[in-house]
Amino acid sequence: MTEARPIILTCGEPAGVGPELAPKALASGVPFVFLGDPRHLPEGTAWAEVTAPGEPVADGVLAVLRHDFPAPARPGQPDPANAPAVIEVIARAVDLAMSGAAGGICTLPINKEALKRGAGFGFPGHTEYLAHLAGDVPVVMMLASTTVQPPCRVVPVTIHIPLSEVPLALTPLRLEQAIRITDAAMRRDFGLAQPRLAIAGLNPHAGENGVMGDEEARWMAPLIERLRREGFDLRGPLPADTMFHPAARARYDAALCAYHDQALIPIKTLDFAGGVNITLGLPFVRTSPDHGTAFDIAGQGIADAESVIAALRMAHEMAARR
């Protein structure tokens, strides 16, 4: 691995816990720079303005790439006037990562409702917007544990849609694309020469030979067999309810799940505080803490930094492999 360039930590929604997490993230030991408005940081934060990632600052001082916002941060009360600046920060971070000035980005949480209300934000979330900024590349979301062994890494093949729509949205093309993106990312970003991927069935007991649904037998198993012949190390379709105990996780490196809760319930149960959100398929590294803006505790100084610290460390490790 090579020495990675600094990570950009975007400010996220300034009315959330992002501003108080930034100085706490110095405990990660990872070189990073905060991109946002320093006026939103907690009172007493030691910070120094830099003009480019990597400019030296004193130990224990937060390096800040300044991006001024039009309104102050009121904890728990997002201001629509700040929405355009939140979006600009994300785009600026992507420019820095794609130009090579930064090793990657770690994004603090945004509030989609506030962005839509204040700036007409037309994307479901960070992931889709980042894919758009990168040239509308196909991406998948991975959630990865950092404190449990064997690791739990999950990829929901369908994400933010009603459960009733999953059977139609889970297509052979979508699953194949997710397998290919995940396999490539596990090789490049996790250093695995032959990633082992487990594929969860859609139905209870993976359909139980068609008794509880036929998607597994009708098209999932044939797709998996075809990709095996190409050289992919795949197992499945597997019953999802027995995929996540320690002995099962030891048999694969990442699990592809049919829908949101099938993937996120196990990761959040096993490693709620230490989970990291990773976008696979981008031309740059992107991670984020696995939590939201937490308006209910914003500004109180009690937000747990474990997930953002884990996300920064993972971004740093991934960037060092690129």
Curated annotation (Swiss-Prot):
InterPro entries: PdxA (IPR037510), PdxA_fam (IPR005255). Its cofactor is Zn(2+); Mg(2+); Co(2+). One of its GO terms (biological process) is pyridoxal phosphate biosynthetic process. Substrate binds at H126, T127, K268, N277, R286. Keywords: Cobalt, Cytoplasm, Magnesium, Metal-binding, NAD, NADP, Oxidoreductase, Pyridoxine biosynthesis, Zinc. Binds 1 divalent metal cation per subunit. Can use ions such as Zn(2+), Mg(2+) or Co(2+). It is found in: Cytoplasm. GO terms for cellular component: cytoplasm. It comes from the Bacteria. The keyword Hydrolase does not apply. A divalent metal cation binds at H160, H205, H260. One of its GO terms (molecular function) is magnesium ion binding. Its main location: cytoplasm. PANTHER family: 4-HYDROXYTHREONINE-4-PHOSPHATE DEHYDROGENASE, D-THREONATE 4-PHOSPHATE DEHYDROGENASE. Belongs to the PdxA family. Homodimer. This is 4-hydroxythreonine-4-phosphate dehydrogenase.
